[in-house]
């Protein structure tokens, strides 16, 4: 049996980093990609320490040429890509009134278009081989809109809809599986970077929004801090468990907290399988 090949974006730290290690420990050959190779040392050392088959490559999901070059290089070495994990992304908290057009486009370009570009690049080989699994990292913010996160949530709602639509016809026709992962708070550089960005920019300066923003920041620290959120390794384990399922769910919450937080949106169809079957009827099947 040939070794399975996994491609992960945003693997320099946090969830991508931990998922790369776990999959390699399971016997996968992992192509762990990142925008900035200056950040590769920690993953490189961890792979060497554990004698894991991890190949680190440069890939920027906001640049088509970068994606095409990386995927082309991989497919010169491998027959196909078995698993794609679209993990690269960033948080952003700002009111619509205060966000610049450049900031809004940056979020869409990274969090949503990055997923679409990567899927477009990898799906052809999966379809040709009639097998594969594409994992898109979303958030509870892809199901429930949250204060000061409307721009971030809009990108994650987009990831949810994109995944759901592909699962409705590509999966049953070509045996390419799709799952969207919906964590709550993760103790990672993602959260740390968001908090640092908020603090460095002074948060929300508008007097009318300021009291609301201060309350939000208190809740953010409470819900996303140690003890009330998951570690990157815990969420990575959920991802690996999902990949190993014969018939994986379309939607995957990663904790009891995320299940509870999204229950009003998900309780009628927790796995997304019922909706997948319903939408499939649009194909006349």
What are the language-model segments listed below?
Residues 12-14:
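Conserved glycine-rich cofactor-binding loop
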Residues 52, 73-84, 92:
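A glycine-rich helix->loop->beta "capping" turn
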Residues 58-69, 101:
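The beta1-alpha1 cofactor-binding region of Rossmann-like NAD(H)/NADP(H)-dependent oxidoreductases
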Residues 119, 155:
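Active-site helix of classical SDR
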Residues 171-248:
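SDR active-site lid
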């Amino acid at each position: 049996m040939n070794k399975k090949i996994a491609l992960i974006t945003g693997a320099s730290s946090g969830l991508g980093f931990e998922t790369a290690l776990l999959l390699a420990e399971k016997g996968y050959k992992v192509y762990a990609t990142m925008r900035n190779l200056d950040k590769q040392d920690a993953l490189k050392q961890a792979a060497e320490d554990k004698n894991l088959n991890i190949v680190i490559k440069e890939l920027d999901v906001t640049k088509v040429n970068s994606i095409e070059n990386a995927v082309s290089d991989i497919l010169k070495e491998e027959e196909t890509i078995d698993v794609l994990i679209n993990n690269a992304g960033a948080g952003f908290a700002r009111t619509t009134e205060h966000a610049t057009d450049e900031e809004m486009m940056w979020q869409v370009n990274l969090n949503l278009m990055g997923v679409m570009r990567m899927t477009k690049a990898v799906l052809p080989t999966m379809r040709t081989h009639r097998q594969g699994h594409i994992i898109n990292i979303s958030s509870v913010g892809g199901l429930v809109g949250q204060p000061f996160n409307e721009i971030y949530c809009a990108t994650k709602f987009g990831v949810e809809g994109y995944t759901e639509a592909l699962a409705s016809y590509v999966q049953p026709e070509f045996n390419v599986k799709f799952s969207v992962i919906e964590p709550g708070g993760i103790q990672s550089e993602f959260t740390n970077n968001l908090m640092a960005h908020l603090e460095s920019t002074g948060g929300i300066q508008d007097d009318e929004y300021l009291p609301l923003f201060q309350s939000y920041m208190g809740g953010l620290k409470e819900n996303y801090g140690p003890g009330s959120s998951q570690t990157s390794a815990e969420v990575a384990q959920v991802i690996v468990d999902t990949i190993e399922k014969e018939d994986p769910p379309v939607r995957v919450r990663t904790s009891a907290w995320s299940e509870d937080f999204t229950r009003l949106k998900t309780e009628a169809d927790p796995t997304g399988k019922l909706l997948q079957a319903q939408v499939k009827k649009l194909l006349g099947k």
